[in-house]
Amino acid sequence: MALSTLWLVLMLWTSLFSDSQCSTLSQAELQELEQIHTWVVSRSFPCSVTCGLGLLTQELCPIGVTRNISTSSCKLRTISCLDSWQCGLKTQTATVGRRLVLDCLEEVMEAMGRFSFVVSWRFAFAIITTDDSLFTRYEALSLDKVVLDPLREEDSGTYRCDVLDTGKRRVKRMYKGVKVLSPKDLSLDFAQGLIHWEIPESRFANLTSSRKVYSSSTIRNIVIISVPLSFAIAVVIFIFLFCYSRRARRAAHLCQDNI
């Protein structure tokens, strides 16, 4: 115990009363340091995607240069970024006979190359789900995408895409739900539908009819019957009011005679 205490005191004494000083750089060393190109990240842009592997753009500038993308001294570089490898489920609807492309990597494949990833596809037939036990292996002709051309009703279901990098680390899992409809069942032409609804006379086209609801003879009979009926009702009301007024007057006279 005493030996360790003595050793600690000697170390403190050496550090406090040491005559060592910070060495200064010579002029030649300063010139050599100025020739070294040191780049720092002056600005970083958000990742291109919120899930899965994306691309991130950074601005690199040498030390002492102001932050300005247009400055010739600065340069931009693109690197990969990953916030979350789970992308969840997305659904889309298409009609039979059309061409449908399910892309798993999109811009990342073009930027980093085809052989930087291992892509596998699985398929759950005729159901929209994220239950992995319902998926079976799906052979895609193109590794990074599934091309359905022409689209058939048997192609409806959920497609799952798994992406691994060269280190066998999962960087993306995506679910694509595909609903296939017959062109006779539903028209998905949004532009044509919007034009149709912007025309005022086309909004209630189904409510108009080219033929009359009632014939002219029917209308004439209705008028012939309604006029006498209305007159009779008016006469009855007039007689009722006349009798009521006479009865009221008679009652008033009787009251005066009794007084």
UniProtKB/Swiss-Prot annotation:
Residue ranges crossing the lipid bilayer per the database entry: 222-242
One Gene Ontology biological process: sperm-egg recognition
Signal sequence segment: 1-18
Chain ranges on the Cytoplasmic side, renumbered to this chain: 243-259
Membrane-topology annotation of the record: Single-pass type I membrane protein
Null allele phenotype: Mutants develop normally into adult males and females. Male mutants are sterile, whereas females show normal fertility.
Boundaries of every Ig-like domain copy: 97-172
Keyword Transmembrane in record: yes
Compartment list: Cell membrane
Keywords annotated in UniProt: Cell membrane, Disulfide bond, Immunoglobulin domain, Membrane, Signal, Transmembrane, Transmembrane helix
Tissue expression as described in the entry: Expressed in sperm.
InterPro entries: Ig-like_dom, Ig-like_dom_sf, Ig-like_fold, TMEM81
Cysteines engaged in disulfide bonds, as pairs: 104-161
Highest taxon in the source lineage: Eukaryota
Membrane topology (Extracellular): 19-221
Coiled coil: none
The keyword Calcium belongs to this UniProt entry's keyword annotation: no
Listed GO CC annotations: plasma membrane
Protein role: Essential fertilization factor required for male fertility. Part of a conserved trimeric sperm complex with the essential fertilization factors IZUMO1 and SPACA6 which bridges sperm and oocyte membranes during fertilization by binding to IZUMO1R/JUNO on the oocyte.
Oligomer status and interactors: Forms a complex with izumo1 and spaca6 on spermatocyte cell membrane. The complex binds to oocyte protein bncr.
Protein name from the UniProt record: Transmembrane protein 81
